[in-house]
């Protein structure tokens, strides 16, 4: 992850302008995006320990129908400078076409246009029967990068929504039973997706563990990240794998790059008695992390093969901000947050998350805006 390039600077500047937060803490939002000098001193009552602060939330997208199309199932969040809009992909919804939605202002999101339908090279639309689009990033040339849990796959789509290419995925990452070498659990494959600040490195994270990385005692906390570098020809090549360990019982819905070579990882879990839980962990020096591509079983690997992480925000401990809930939650502000984006960092950064309502009457499509001090 090299230093930022002009395309990213322009994107970050536009994203900063688009990230309008609640008036009560607008100065702190400016600080997070480099447009003001305020500090977080006045946000103690909004703490999400140890280093996060809840700024605002919005349910304005919840159960929205736009030009006859139901919005829901949003599982990713990225900024598209060419559209001057935030973008989010629908994971899957039966035979409905796979779509990317566009909206502005994360404090009070408003849809800006009809969604973009994602299509195969022959022009036929992907749908919920053959894609489960969980990750989304915008490449420097404006193409859309989308990860799907179905196979899994990582595909590149043009701005017309037509697939242009796909990235190579190691055989063992296929869902168990779909191929002879597959070790992934269905609906727990390539969920997180991000592009480095340089625009030349892609990272995708596994939501769950490969069966080959589970210990004899059943420890399934070891996850793999795939790292791709861009060749001089412009094509993307898989260059290495990174090992990451979650807290027991957690999955990884999202990963986002920030700074020179740092990552922010979202860990999450759900229980019927406590609802959703989410924590954000920072990983520094990802570029120097050991390559574990040839490690057969991460649970038997030396501790040094697994990246170190630091808890920066426990969202269960955020203030509720008066948020409503339709199901049992230890904190009603929480829902099924699966998409995440960062403006700024290291230091004080604006972090926003979006929840996947699964097109369910008991869940929200909610945007949560935070300030987080990132190492």
Model regions: which residues?
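Secretory targeting and sorting signals
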Residues: 1-31
């Amino acid at each position: 992850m090299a230093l930022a390039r002009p395309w990213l600077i322009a994107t970050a500047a536009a994203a900063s302008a688009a990230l309008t937060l609640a008036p009560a803490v607008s100065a702190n939002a400016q600080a997070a995006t480099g447009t003001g000098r305020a500090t977080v001193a006045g946000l103690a009552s909004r703490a999400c320990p140890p280093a996060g602060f809840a700024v605002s939330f919005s349910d304005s997208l919840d159960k929205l129908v736009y030009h006859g199309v139901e919005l829901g199932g949003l599982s990713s969040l990225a900024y598209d400078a060419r559209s001057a809009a935030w973008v989010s992909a629908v994971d899957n919804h039966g035979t409905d076409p796979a779509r990317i939605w566009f909206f502005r202002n994360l404090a009070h999101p408003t849809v800006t246009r009809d969604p973009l339908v994602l299509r195969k090279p022959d022009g036929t639309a992907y749908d919920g029967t053959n894609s489960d689009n969980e990750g989304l990033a915008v490449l420097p040339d404006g193409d859309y990068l989308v990860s799907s849990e179905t196979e899994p796959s990582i595909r590149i789509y043009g701005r017309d929504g037509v697939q242009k290419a796909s990235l190579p995925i190691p055989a063992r990452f296929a869902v168990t039973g779909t191929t002879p070498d597959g070790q992934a659990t269905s609906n727990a494959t390539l969920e997180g997706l991000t592009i480095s600040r340089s625009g030349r490195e892609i990272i995708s994270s596994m939501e769950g563990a490969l069966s080959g990385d589970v210990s004899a005692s059943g420890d399934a906390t070891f996850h793999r990240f795939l790292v791709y570098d861009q060749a001089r020809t412009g094509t993307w090549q898989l260059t290495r794998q990174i090992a990451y360990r979650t807290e027991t019982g957690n999955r990884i819905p999202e990963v986002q790059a920030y700074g020179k070579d740092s990552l922010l990882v979202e860990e999450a879990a759900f229980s019927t008695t406590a609802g959703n839980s989410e924590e954000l962990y920072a990983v520094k020096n990802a570029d120097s992390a050991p390559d574990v591509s040839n490690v057969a079983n991460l649970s038997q690997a030396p501790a040094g093969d697994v990246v170190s992480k630091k808890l920066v925000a426990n969202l269960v401990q955020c203030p509720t901000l008066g948020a409503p809930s339709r199901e049992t939650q230890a904190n009603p502000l929480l829902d099924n947050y699966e998409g995440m984006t960062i403006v700024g960092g290291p230091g004080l950064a604006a972090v926003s998350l979006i929840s996947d309502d699964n097109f369910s009457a008991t869940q929200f499509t909610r945007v949560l805006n935070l300030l987080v001090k990132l190492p």
